[in-house]
Swiss-Prot record:
GO terms for biological process: phenylalanyl-tRNA aminoacylation. NCBIfam families: pheS. This is Phenylalanine--tRNA ligase alpha subunit. Keywords: Aminoacyl-tRNA synthetase, ATP-binding, Cytoplasm, Ligase, Magnesium, Metal-binding, Nucleotide-binding, Protein biosynthesis. Its EC number is 6.1.1.20. The keyword Cytoplasm applies. It is found in: Cytoplasm. Its cofactor is Mg(2+). CDD domains: PheRS_alpha_core. GO terms for cellular component: cytoplasm. It catalyses: tRNA(Phe) + L-phenylalanine + ATP = L-phenylalanyl-tRNA(Phe) + AMP + diphosphate + H(+). One of its GO terms (molecular function) is ATP binding.
Length: 338
């Protein structure tokens, strides 16, 4: 039986050395060391040996088994290493080659308009202030002279979370928060997203506004008109006509709607301006004393103005866009034009 074990070992080692794949080595492991393998068959014959021969042959069989397992594991590691080297050689990358060129993105037209308007007002001494989009009723309405029973609240279709929390309907709450934190003088603009329950070709339930605030001693309506005229001339071009019409906003008094000469027909009258020659772009006015009282300012010693414009409205006039929904449809053909 010793000769049989020695012959089995030599034959197995030779076959293992000749195996060139993991599959072949696995088959040899089963052939020699499996439950029905050659070595297992030999060890089953130990019972027929004498008591003196059995431990000697059994120890030899275990030695053969250990040698075969060790050689199988070593050869398997070599085969796997060779396979890995071959794959790396086959899939080798030339790291000196230039990378794939990705298409360049562009800024969204709304972002471009916000940045351009912000830059103009920065040149006029205004800084950018921001605030939360989910607001308290106090900041969005009450502090801006919208009492709970005020009919002016019906002018805005509001998304309410509960009785006191809502999605802001304008960025004016930023002005209230700023005045509560800072003493005059204050000069800010507050660009941001606002929400109203409205949706059609010229309205969206989510849109963008830029509102401005200036509070100091001796601020007049003439200052308001001068700053807004300066903005219009910088943004739409010099020589654009500007007019102010009386209007109403709960947080300003007096209040005005600001129109510019139609950028499409140069004031001659067309379909866009409904033959009037004028286009409304923003609302403005002198801050109501009641707003000052809510933020702790003394209306007897300071004065100021506020204004606000819809960014989409300005962008539509700037670029001649007829449908507000184009800004939100994510149509690459439209966005690539900017």
């Amino acid at each position: 039986m010793k000769e049989q074990l020695d012959g089995l070992l030599q034959s197995a080692l030779k076959e293992i050395d000749g195996a060139g794949s993991e599959e072949a080595l696995q088959e040899l492991r089963i052939k020699y060391l499996g439950k029905k393998g050659a070595l297992t068959a030999v060890m089953k014959g130990l019972g027929a040996l004498s008591a003196e021969e059995r431990p000697v042959v059994g120890q030899l069989a275990n030695t053969v088994k250990d040698q075969l397992e060790a050689h199988l594991d070593e050869t398997l590691a070599q085969v796997r290493d060779a396979s890995k080297r071959e794959r790396l050689q086959r899939e080798r990358l030339d790291v000196t080659l230039p990378g794939r060129r990705l298409p360049h993105g562009t800024k969204h037209p709304i972002t471009l308009v916000i940045e351009e308007i912000s830059e103009i007002f920065a040149g006029l001494g205004f800084r950018v202030a921001e605030g939360p989009e989910v607001e308290l009723d106090f900041y969005n309405f009450e502090a801006l002279n919208f009492p709970k029973d005020h009919p002016a609240r019906d002018m805005q279709d509001t998304f309410f979370v509960d009785d006191s929390i809502l999605l802001r309907t304008h960025t004016s709450p930023v002005q209230v928060r700023t005045m509560l934190k800072h003493a005059p003088p204050v000069r800010i603009i507050s660009p941001g997203t606002v929400y109203r329950c409205d949706s059609d070709a010229t309205h969206s339930p989510m849109f963008h506004q830029i509102e401005g605030l200036m509070v100091d001693t001796g601020v007049t309506f003439g200052d308001l008109k001068g700053i807004l005229t300066n903005f219009v001339n910088q943004y739409f071009g010099k020589g654009i006509g500007v007019r102010l019409r009386p209007s109403f906003f709960p947080f300003t008094e007096p209040s005005a709607e600001v129109d510019i000469a139609c950028v499409m027909c140069k004031g001659k009258g067309c379909r866009v301006c409904k033959e009037s020659g004028w286009l409304e772009i923003l609302g403005a006015g002198m801050i109501d004393p009641e707003v000052y009282r809510h933020v702790g300012y003394d209306p007897e010693t300071i004065s100021g103005f506020a204004f606000g414009m819809g960014v989409e409205r300005v962008a539509m006039l700037k670029y001649g866009i007829g449908d507000l929904r184009l800004f939100f449809d994510n149509d690459v053909r439209f966005l690539q034009q900017f």
